[in-house]
Design a protein with these regions (language model features):
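Short, polar/flexible loop-turn hinges at active-site or ligand-entry regions and domain interfaces
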Residues: 1, 21-27, 121-128, 150-151
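Active-site activation/catalytic loop segments of kinase-like enzymes and analogous catalytic loops
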Residues: 108-147, 162-179
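All-alpha amphipathic helical-bundle segments outside canonical DNA-binding/catalytic cores
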Residues: 28-29, 150-162
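Residues at helix-coil transition
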Residues: 9-20, 65-68, 87, 116, ...
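Membrane-helix interface segments
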Residues: 52, 70-71, 92, 150-154
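A cross-family kinase active-site recognition segment
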Residues: 1-57, 67-74, 101-105, 181-182
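An acidic site on a long C-lobe helix of protein kinase domains
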Residues: 3-7, 52-55, 79, 107-110, ...
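Active-site acidic catalytic loop and adjacent metal/ATP-binding pocket
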Residues: 14, 58-110, 115
Length: 184
């Protein structure tokens, strides 16, 4: 569908912007993005931990040992998904919302988070195809073509890392609810 093509185009355009030309060198650190993110979400997880979940502790131990070498540096949105994009009446992407997690980092990690739709929601491929929703492989290939980036065998890591990030966010919310400090 045009909506998914526009989503793909939006994140692709974001990731190919030259941070130096845009004078955004100070918007964030350029290296070790995933290491910093793993540290951030691990800290949030432990600070908010409500009960010990062995599989989460194993993942926290596993992640730092498997981080791929960062090949690209770009603006990353941090929460690029369908409900953070505004479309006009013709399904054109006209605005990207919710920038509080944005920084400079690894665009492939950002795109992995964006693709969690295919991993969290069980999508029947025939139904999705009928609605014009591409499968993940088609969507990823279009992104790589648009950005001229290459992805070796690290895609699974980016998805696992993104699921970990979601777990860290959810645990942080749960901790704030427990502590009575949740905003809503």
């Amino acid at each position: 569908s045009l909506v998914f093509d526009q989503l793909n185009q939006g994140i692709s355009l974001l990731h190919i912007q030259d941070i130096n030309t845009l004078e955004l060198e100070d918007f964030g650190k350029t290296g070790n993005y995933i290491e910093r993110q793993v540290s951030r979400w691990t800290k949030q997880y432990f600070d908010s931990e409500t009960e010990k979940i062995d599989s989460m502790h194993k993942l926290i131990e596993w992640l730092p040992k498997r981080i791929p070498k960062q090949k690209y540096v770009s603006i990353v949105h941090g929460d690029y998904r369908l409900d953070n994009v505004v479309f006009d009446n013709n399904d054109n992407n006209i605005a990207i919302l919710d920038w509080e997690l944005s920084t400079i980092g690894d665009p492939l990690a950002d795109f992995g988070y964006h693709c969690l739709l295919w991993h969290i929601a069980k999508i029947d491929n025939d139904v999705a195809k009928g609605l014009g929703i591409p499968n993940e492989d088609e969507y990823l290939k279009k992104y790589l073509s648009r950005t001229k980036m290459q992805l070796d065998s690290d895609w699974e890591f980016y998805i696992i890392f993104s699921l970990f990030k979601v777990a860290g966010i959810c645990q942080g919310i749960l901790g704030r609810v427990r502590d009575g400090t949740a905003a809503s």
